[in-house]
């Protein structure tokens, strides 16, 4: 359990806590200890059966989903895991007591076996969603598919059609739709409290250090290896505004985005290509000392530090080595990133309703969306 406690002390942080400008400021409670702040409804009756789940992709997101089984063992049990890393498979095996023949290097190995779980959580990289989703649907698994569903319309349609033909449930991990605040907004709109919706103004503040971690140094920095930022980061938000608009379909879209800061042209004159060796590290807001090492030295190895230690060893020595040699220790102005750091989207819906959305990577706050909904009777 120590592995999971280190990595996910803040799974149930509420939106106010997530506003912190520090990466791991409030990661001082485990999910079990933080039930009052959790998004789950703890008053639900105990279910009559436990859902068995196969986790495909044991990274940060796959592990977060699996942690539900740790907190609620009568509701869910992880019975298999797919991940190419031995350290990840061993941790899952230990925490979830997985049988020897139910952890795999490749999802194809699991898909070739006779069905052994009721559902599968697919948390592979963005561009690797379609093939496992189609394969497991054909085997009769119900599917929780991490967002985005896929990175092309064709792949999305194939996933949906296969699930329909196979008679299995498909849920995409647009988890913000189920947050109490999102549900309350939907409730008020449907009740006509502000009349007919005229316009939605919505901002997603990614957080400056989060953007640097995930979309400059990290896994989502190159469109060819993942997808564009609006898809990888802000599909939550596009899903929300469409959800709030109800049956009104989007008719027109215009969008502009730029990558104007995290470029080689903006690299400080005396900066090094590696952050740990850089002479301007102390004054840089993207210093790995500030984002990772500061908290690790206090014993905190939860996200985002957990992602840096890809070998599964959570100590200062392993973290320092990863920062010295791996992608997360690179200068943010000397990476191979090419995705937008800010983007605006204007949408026109049926009935003349409009939406103005902004994704901004240069904010102090992280994850605290700002939404104003204007209606015919108020806002």
Residues of each region from the PLM?
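Predominantly a Rossmann-like dinucleotide-binding segment in NAD(P)-dependent oxidoreductases
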Residues: 176-330
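Short, Asp-centered acidic motifs that coordinate Mg2+ and/or phosphate
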Residues: 80, 119, 199
């Amino acid at each position: 359990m120590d592995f999971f406690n280190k990595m996910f002390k803040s799974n149930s942080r509420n939106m106010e806590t997530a506003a912190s400008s520090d990466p791991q400021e409030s990661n001082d409670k485990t999910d079990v200890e933080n039930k009052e702040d959790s998004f789950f409804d703890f008053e639900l009756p105990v279910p009559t059966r436990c859902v068995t789940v196969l986790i495909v992709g044991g990274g940060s997101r796959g592990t977060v989903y699996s942690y539900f089984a740790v907190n609620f063992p009568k509701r869910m049990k992880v019975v298999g895991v797919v991940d190419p890393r031995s350290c990840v498979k061993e941790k899952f095996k230990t925490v979830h007591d997985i049988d020897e023949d139910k952890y795999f290097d490749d999802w194809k190995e699991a898909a070739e076996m006779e069905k052994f779980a009721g559902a599968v959580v697919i948390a592979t990289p963005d561009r690797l969603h379609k093939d496992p989703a189609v394969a497991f649907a054909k085997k009769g698994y119900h599917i929780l598919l991490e967002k985005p569903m896929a990175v092309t319309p064709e792949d999305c349609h194939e996933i949906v059609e296969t699930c329909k033909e196979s008679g299995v449930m498909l849920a995409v991990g647009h988890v913000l739709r189920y947050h109490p605040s999102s549900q309350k907004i939907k409730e008020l709109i449907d009740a006509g409290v502000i009349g007919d919706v005229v316009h939605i103004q919505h901002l997603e503040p990614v957080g400056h250090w989060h953007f640097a971690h995930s979309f400059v140094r990290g896994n989502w920095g190159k469109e060819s290896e993942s997808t564009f930022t609006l898809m990888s980061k802000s599909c939550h938000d596009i899903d929300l505004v469409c959800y709030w608009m109800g049956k009104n379909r989007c008719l027109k879209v215009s969008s502009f985005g730029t990558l104007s800061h995290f470029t080689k042209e903006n690299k400080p004159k005396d900066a090094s290509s590696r952050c740990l060796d850089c002479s301007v590290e102390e004054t840089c807001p993207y210093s790995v000392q500030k984002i990772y090492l500061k908290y690790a030295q206090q014993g905190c190895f939860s996200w985002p530090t957990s992602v840096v230690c890809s070998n599964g060893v959570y100590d200062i020595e392993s973290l320092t080595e990863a920062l010295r040699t791996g992608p997360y220790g690179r200068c943010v102005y000397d990476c191979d990133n090419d995705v937008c750091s800010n983007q605006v989207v204007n949408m026109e819906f049926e009935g003349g309703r409009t939406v103005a959305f902004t994704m901004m990577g240069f904010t102090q706050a992280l994850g605290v969306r700002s939404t104003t909904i204007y209606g015919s009777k108020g806002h």
